[in-house]
A protein has these predicted regions:
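Active-site-proximal C-terminal subdomain of hydrolase catalytic domains
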Residues: 1-99
Length: 99
């Protein structure tokens, strides 16, 4: 939490696993789901999709994950990835601040 509580700065929120993050090694890490996919997706939602409100970016990220992978395949770890990927912060805040 040092990056969140840094004096004269710090983060406004944090996204991450509450448990062990699952992933696919190698080039498939961006296509196979798991921690790498969902972590990259939050940045895609912000940068490419323009979701600059934290809660909206988080919602769209999880929604896109759930619609992209088979949530009934428990062995693949997709359900666990979504359940363990937590957002800590105020969902109403705007990324980059307000003008």
């Amino acid at each position: 939490w040092r990056f969140v509580r840094a004096r004269d700065g710090g983060a406004i929120a944090s996204f991450g696993n509450t448990g062990l993050g699952y992933g696919v090694p190698g080039n498939d890490c961006t296509t196979g789901g798991g921690d790498a996919w969902i972590t990259i997706e939050i940045f895609r939602q912000y940068g490419a999709e323009g979701k600059d409100i934290l809660g909206d970016a988080y919602y769209e990220t999880v929604n896109h994950y759930v619609s992209s992978f088979d949530m009934t395949d428990l062995g693949a770890g997709h359900t666990k990835t979504v359940q363990q990927w937590a957002f800590m912060g105020d969902p109403s805040l705007k990324i980059g601040g307000y003008d």
